[in-house]
């Protein structure tokens, strides 16, 4: 024990500094509490100093000029009353809370029924040996919808399959880990993380008070995450096959336990064999049903997910197809909930994992147990975001921040690049997406 402690304390270099610094950071929940304390102090100083900004769009009806927004102390009687009286509403109205919990109700069933694990296993084991590395990397990236199943199932499975193909298992483990962890935010479809982040984005915009009616779309990051899937894929493939595996040397251990060098198909006696194939087939039918249902609600008469009257209340120049499709975008959280729920239920029924509705309810309840820490974090984050808005510092900082960036004369791509670099640096110390 003493040796391990000594080794940890003597780590040098940039990675050692990053690890030591990260370990010294408090829990993300307390980071938010410390930020709230700092916010209270800043709001008092700003209010006493008369800090203000002019709203970029709102007009003061009394003067006809831009509306002036003054900083408000969080220790004012109104804000103290709001803190205690509205505490339940502040927590429950936190947008990411509802979005994430709804999606996880369905994803929890898909994970606990074995659907995610079986789907990843089937995809990887069906890969030609020549394409084993890119298939492992791709399935690993897609597996971020499966939460911990990507780490628990795919990483060791990749090692077994590489050994069965006569390749070094550590190369397979490296490729799978790079896909699961390094490609965590790359996918061909939105998922739980997108539900979390677009909810936080809505809260941030709401706190700025720039546009209270603005809403985000869970598919807003889809272009980025889908493109990054195919950017990461060749990189992982090249690094694994051309850099990592040659350094490991030839594999002389033969096929590992549970795998045969000339047979990479699942054991028919295994649940992930013939029985799993039946479950995956039923899950596919369930997925087609959900897709058909959403298409029906978009194109069928009545079009409940298309607001055909949306353009009647806005000028023709401001109306677009996206305005009319707003209900469809807002329904995607429910769509992913239903997709994960029905595919997991269909798989579980076919394999015997779910024998009655009680098993289904138990899986949903278990998934909510796993969200306990997130609920605590959401409570702290919700109050920080809300208090930021109550103090008017959100709008004031947004207006003055935009003016400061504009005054530098830096081109927008460079500003965005600096933001990406800052976020990447922050990732080394704070792993939680919601905490960042």
Where are these regions (language model features)?
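Membrane-core helix-loop-helix motifs of multi-pass transport proteins
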Residues: 19, 23, 27, 155, ...
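Hydrophobic alpha-helical transmembrane segments of multi-pass integral membrane proteins
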Residues: 100-102, 128-159, 164, 375-384, ...
């Amino acid at each position: 024990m003493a040796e391990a402690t000594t080794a940890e304390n003597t780590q040098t270099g940039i990675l050692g500094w990053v690890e030591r610094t990260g370990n010294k950071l408090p829990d993300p929940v307390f980071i938010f509490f410390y930020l709230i304390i700092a916010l209270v102090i800043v709001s008092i100083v700003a209010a006493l100093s008369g800090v203000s900004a002019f709203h970029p769009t709102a007009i003061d009806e009394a003067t006809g000029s831009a509306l002036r927004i003054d900083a408000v102390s969080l220790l004012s009687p109104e804000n103290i009353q709001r803190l205690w009286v509205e505490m339940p509403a502040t927590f429950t109205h936190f947008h990411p809370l509802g979005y994430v919990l709804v999606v996880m109700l369905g994803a929890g069933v898909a994970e606990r029924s074995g659907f995610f694990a079986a789907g990843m296993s089937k995809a990887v084991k069906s890969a030609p040996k020549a394409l084993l590395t890119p298939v492992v990397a791709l399935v690993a990236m897609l597996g971020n919808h499966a939460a911990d199943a990507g780490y628990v199932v795919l990483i060791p499975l990749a090692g077994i399959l590489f050994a069965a193909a006569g390749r070094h298992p550590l190369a397979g483990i490296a490729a799978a880990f790079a896909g699961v962890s390094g490609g965590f935010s790359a996918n061909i479809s939105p998922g739980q993380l997108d539900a979390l982040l677009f909810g936080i984005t809505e809260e941030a915009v709401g706190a700025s008070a720039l546009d209270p009616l603005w809403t985000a779309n869970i598919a807003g990051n889809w272009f980025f995450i889908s493109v990054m899937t195919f950017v990461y894929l060749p990189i992982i493939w090249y690094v694994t096959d051309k850099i990592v595996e040659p350094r490991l040397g030839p594999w002389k251990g033969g096929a590992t336990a549970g795998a045969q060098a000339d047979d990479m198909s699942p054991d028919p006696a295994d649940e992930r064999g013939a029985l799993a194939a039946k479950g995956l087939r039923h899950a596919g039918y369930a997925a087609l049903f959900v897709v058909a249902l959403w298409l029906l609600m978009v194109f069928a008469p009545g079009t409940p997910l298309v607001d055909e009257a949306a353009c009647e209340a806005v000028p023709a120049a401001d109306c677009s197809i996206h305005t009319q499709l707003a209900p469809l975008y807002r329904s995607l959280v429910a769509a992913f909930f239903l997709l994960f729920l029905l595919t997991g239920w269909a798989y579980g029924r076919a394999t015997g994992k779910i024998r009655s509705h009680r098993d289904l309810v138990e899986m949903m309840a278990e998934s909510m147990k796993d969200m306990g820490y997130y609920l605590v974090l959401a409570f702290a984050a919700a109050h920080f975001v809300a208090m930021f808005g109550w103090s008017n510092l959100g709008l004031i900082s947004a207006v003055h921040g935009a003016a400061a960036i504009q005054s530098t004369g830096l081109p927008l791509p460079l500003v965005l690049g600096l933001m990406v670099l800052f976020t990447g640096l922050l990732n080394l110390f704070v792993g939680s997406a919601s905490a960042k």
